[in-house]
């Protein structure tokens, strides 16, 4: 279940960042879209920047 939630956070953040821009999206917005409490995000990522770095690392590996 923990991995599923982390994947949902990742996918939702990627979608929101690409549609609205990183600076326009809050952790609260991501959590709301995922359907979890904002504090629950921090069980998976330390910050919004950590989510972004995870996304960037994923694509860096994908395009190698």
Label each PLM-derived region with a short phrase.
Residues 8-15, 19, 33, 50-64:
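Alpha-helical structural segments
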């Amino acid at each position: 279940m923990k991995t599923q939630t982390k994947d949902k956070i990742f996918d939702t953040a990627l979608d929101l960042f690409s549609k609205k821009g990183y600076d326009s999206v809050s952790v609260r917005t991501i959590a709301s879209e995922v359907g979890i409490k904002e504090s629950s995000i921090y069980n998976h990522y330390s910050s919004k920047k950590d989510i972004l770095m995870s996304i960037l690392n994923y694509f860096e590996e994908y395009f190698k």
